Amino acid sequence: MKLLRLIVLLAGLSCLAPAKAADSPARVTVIFDAFGKPSALERGWGYSALVEYKGKRILFDTGGQYQTFAENVRKLKIDLKTLDFVVISHRHGDHTGGLAYVLEQNPHVKIYAPLETGSFGTPPSPPAAKALLRNAAGITPDLRYFNGQPPDNLTIDSPWPGTKFTLIDKSIEIAPGLFLVKTVSDSKGTLELNELSLAIRTPKGLALVVGCSHPGIERILEAASQYDTQLYTIVGGLHLVDKSDQQVSEVVNNFKTRWHIERVAAGHCTGEFAQVELERVFGDHHDHSGVGEVIAIPR
């Protein structure tokens, strides 16, 4: 009889385990943006979202202002102490403004950021440093770098002392079905800026979370398609705000005709005209994704 009870108990526990996994959230919660439905949440220029998928909790970017980010985190009852890791898409302040608050709450959290000279504590490479410090004949002593005796390597501190960044220089899988997609901008004003996007493999295709899309959203889609040619949704900043109406319409139409994307939840630097175009092309598959909105991810 005792053996029978034990078997029944173990069978019951085995049935509970899959149910628990199935109940874990599969969603993106927008923490920081400049628009949204009326609520107690603050608005600000920048972007931040909490991504939850298959038991992982990932903070993607941290918005543009410390106080606004902190207030919204508290109002949304998000526990930063239980994050699995943080992804910083790129170096701009409207995506890193709340990082100090994250580190106050979770000082040892793993942070992924793009490898880039001068950012996140990354010094110039030795060849670059040598080029910067080359000697010039005839220069007076008071104008010589380091009194004419430069160090072998230049050092640059991070604005977040003691933080251990994991710096990414190529696209990589960081957890089963979770990928960091690295691209480089060739646009005027952000030339050679490195950017990371987060691709999530779902049963319906990739869900792609983007910060600001400086390299170009279609270039990011191309890079992400190495992990799955089926693209389900894009969430985040598409950087169409400074494009002409014609360019915006072309990109939005390409989402449908070239990339066969099913849904879009655009935010931040996408721009108001682009939002109108997304509404026209995607209809009820255009997910309004202002601050506080929750976007479901297929599981």
Language-model regions, residue ranges each:
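Active-site metal-binding motif and surrounding structural segment of the metallo-beta-lactamase
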Residues: 67-116, 225-235, 239
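Bacterial N-terminal signal peptides
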Residues: 6-15
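Active-site environment of divalent metal-dependent phosphoester hydrolases
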Residues: 37-38, 66-68, 93-97, 118-121, ...
